A protein has these predicted regions:
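Short, low-hydrophobicity acidic/polar segments
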Residues: 1-200, 236-242, 248-260, 265, ...
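Contiguous ligand/interfacial binding patches
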Residues: 199-250, 254-255
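Short linear, low-complexity motifs centered on an aromatic residue
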Residues: 186-205, 338-356
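Short beta-strand segments
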Residues: 26, 42, 197, 207-209, ...
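Intrinsically disordered, low-complexity repeat and linker tracts
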Residues: 1, 322, 326-381
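C2-type phospholipid-binding modules
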Residues: 304-329
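Edge beta-strands of extracellular beta-sandwich domains
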Residues: 93-96, 300-302, 312-314
Length: 381
């Protein structure tokens, strides 16, 4: 993915504002009125936000609450801002649990993290992040890093910027014909071009996303953990009729292989589908390519469609693991059915000699005469 493509498109984000260094929610306290106690309002408790729109063409911009509400800092206190995106890897709004390091659900004052369970299908982009001030912003706060984020920091022009990191491994796919016959050449022959009808990768699908935590900063690989067995995730594509980049992906349309340069040794490279986002951390991923090819099975009949399948393994060196937040381009060389053409070559008879049988002699002992050697043609000087 190019930097130009790495822009927001109005995705749904979820945001927490927590008391600094803890899992406790931040509350805004309204002033007391006479004998009426001050009311407490949660500021951002798993609040739904919208990222900047695609029209903004930006990778960093102001996110807005989905319901249009405006929030304000409490008069005192410092706070942490956390954000995450689960796409549709959860049914409905995400349910976040407070847990300790052992994974047991506990009260907020005993919790060390907030987590949400997800299930991926290969199309979701799971992201998470925490706001952290830049060096320049810390300088604006008098080099007191603990003064963020707060009403004081806001007065100094320092507001939370949550950096969202991609937590899955991304595969994009290209295909090419490995032979001219695979691309349906020569035209009018007994086999048409192979079509790629599906691509799938085996990956774990059930995981737990850590959306906020206490303690030292965690690596991206530690924020999303997967359990259970792997299953096939199927490559999909964007709906060409829809301009909304957030619209659900649709089933892959068949892609015919081509070969335009007759002098080339390999077919044209063709992009297939959108991308597959899989659980990171594996050294290899089983890959299955579903194919079809129209072939003539009998002279005088019409061609029939033959389903084919090609299996492979996506790996670098078998030792290095695929990392979260990285996109890898996978180029697949495809081979279709090759017509069997049997050539018959007739070997001439070789003179084996003659056998003379005479009853006046012993009829059981014929006389064998070696064949006359063939005189080789003279070689002209």
């Amino acid at each position: 993915m190019t930097d130009a493509e790495n822009v927001w498109a109005g995705q749904t984000l979820w945001v927490y504002m927590l008391q600094k260094g803890s899992m406790d929610l931040a509350y805004y306290k309204a002033p007391a009125v006479g004998t009426t106690a001050a009311a407490e309002t949660e500021v951002f408790n798993n609040k739904k936000f919208n990222a900047p729109n695609a029209a903004d063409n930006t990778k960093s911009g102001l996110a807005t609450t989905a319901d249009g509400t405006i929030a304000y800092y409490p008069v005192s206190g410092n706070y942490d801002f956390w954000g995450y995106r689960v796409d549709d890897a959860v049914a409905g709004d995400p349910v976040v649990k407070l847990v300790n390091d052992a994974g047991d659900e506990v009260a907020a004052d005993q919790a060390t993290k907030r987590v949400v369970d997800i299930k991926i299908d290969g199309s979701q982009d799971i992201m998470a992040g925490k706001a952290a001030p830049s060096t320049d912003e810390v300088a604006k706060l008098g080099n007191y890093a603990d003064n963020f984020y707060s009403a004081y920091a806001a007065r100094k022009g320092v507001q939370p910027n949550i950096t969202f990191n991609h937590l899955l491994t991304r595969f994009t796919f290209e295909v090419r014909a490995g032979s001219k016959a695979t691309a349906g050449l020569p035209a009018g022959g007994n086999t048409d071009a192979v079509k790629v009808t599906g691509v799938s990768v085996d990956s774990k699908t059930t995981g737990t996303l850590t959306v906020a935590y206490t303690g030292e900063t965690k690596a991206a690989a530690d924020l999303l953990t997967f359990t259970g067995d792997a299953s096939a995730l199927t490559l999909k594509q964007r709906d060409a009729a829809l301009a909304d980049n957030n619209a659900p992906l649709v089933a892959l349309e068949p892609v015919s292989l081509t070969w335009t340069d007759d002098a080339a040794t390999i077919g044209d490279v063709i992009k297939v589908g959108e991308a597959l986002l899989v659980a990171p951390g594996q050294t290899e991923y089983p890959l299955t390519i579903a194919l079809s090819q129209d072939v003539l099975q009998k002279v005088g009949e019409t061609k029939v469609t033959m389903p084919l399948e090609q299996k492979a393994t996506i790996k670098m060196d078998g030792v290095k693991a695929f990392e979260p937040g990285k996109s890898y381009k996978v180029t697949i060389t495809v081979y279709g059915l090759e017509e069997i053409k049997v050539t018959a070559t007739l070997v001439p008879w070789v003179d084996g000699g003659s056998i003379d049988i005479d009853d006046d002699r012993n009829p059981n002992e014929g006389e064998y005469t070696e064949p006359t050697p063939t005189t080789p043609e003279p070689i002209e000087p």
